Amino acid sequence: MSAQAQMRALLDQLMGTARDGDETRQRVKFTDDRVCKSHLLDCCPHDILAGTRMDLGECTKIHDLALRADYEIASKERDLFFELDAMDHLESFIAECDRRTELAKKRLAETQEEISAEVSAKAEKVHELNEEIGKLLAKAEQLGAEGNVDESQKILMEVEKVRAKKKEAEEEYRNSMPASSFQQQKLRVCEVCSAYLGLHDNDRRLADHFGGKLHLGFIQIREKLDQLRKTVAEKQEKRNQDRLRRREEREREERLGRRSGSRTRDRRRSRSRDRRRRRSRSTSRERRKFSRSRSRDRYRRHRSRSRSHSRGHRRASRDRSTKYKFSRERSLREESWEYGRNERGPTDWRLENSNGKTASRRSEEKEAGEI
């Protein structure tokens, strides 16, 4: 990569996709499924193991330092939970690496000469000391490259102590088996990167292995996987607590709502009961008032009819008595007239005929008119 390309990549990593107003680069967002989430978290095995014996080539997903910068800016404002995707990716990769390690162990067990359990334990001890020496030498070289010479010298002194222990372990291993078998190279599979290690490897070979990019890359991947598992577990626990708290708050609000609703219903029922009671009393009062009014009306109509009947009866009685009195008087007058007619003579008849009425008749009619 040229110096200009390196500067461009550095600017992308620092400022993101919109560092120079390029709209075409913003068409793909870091949230796109085509973007590698492990790359955004700086733990993609394709980047870490690039240039090693186990180079995986280019990743099938998009790798862009500018998108990583965009993600780092956005992750400060809200949680995107990309750790879960990266954890799944690394778990599948480490599972494949562990599978290769088990296959290598099985192949060694089939090809190498069988040894006793005691000899195997002594050989395992030599391997562990070799591994410790290689790690210490790699750490000393790293500290020396960083300029921390004093710490590097202290680690080299520890390396000398471990070398003495290794020499004693090799003597025990040599004395426990025949010379012909001891000269045979005993291999061991590295538990971290599944590479082969020899029992008689020198310190330089061990330092190159444990300080090499392949072994350190696998250590970085495994440590990142452990960190992601811890982060995901913490976030899931926090999410569960938030969900539980929201559920409790919702249940508390529902209980308060039910209590408030119950009190409201009780008040509503009480008011409705009072209204019904007042309405019932008012209806009863109106009914009694109406009943009394109807009773009074009936009583008044009855009395009116009674009075009318009494007046009519009295009027009829008077009419009948008057009529009876008139008929009685008339009959008496007629009887008296008949009697007087029989007693009067021709002169009286002529006078009556000339006047049309007798004096007694005229007096009777006058009396009847006055009545």
UniProtKB/Swiss-Prot annotation:
Give UniProt keywords alphabetically. Coiled coil, Phosphoprotein
Q: Where is the composition biased (Basic residues)?
A: 258-317
Q: Which GO terms describe its cellular component?
A: nucleus; U1 snRNP
Cite the InterPro entries for this sequence: Luc7-rel
Q: Which residues carry this modification: Phosphoserine?
A: 336, 363
Which superkingdom does the taxonomy of this entry point to? Eukaryota
What Gene Ontology terms for biological process does this UniProt record contain?
A: mRNA splice site recognition; negative regulation of striated muscle tissue development
TM spans (from-to): none
As recorded in UniProt, coiled-coil segments are 87-177, 220-256
Molecular function terms from GO: identical protein binding; mRNA binding; RS domain binding
Q: Where is the composition biased (Basic and acidic residues)?
A: 232-257, 318-351, 361-371
Q: Where is this region: Disordered?
A: 232-371
Pfam families with a match to the protein in the record = LUC7 (PF03194)
Recorded family membership: Belongs to the Luc7 family.
Function recorded in the entry: May bind to RNA via its Arg/Ser-rich domain.
Q: What is this protein called?
A: Putative RNA-binding protein Luc7-like 1
Upper taxonomic lineage: Eukaryota, Metazoa, Chordata, Craniata, Vertebrata
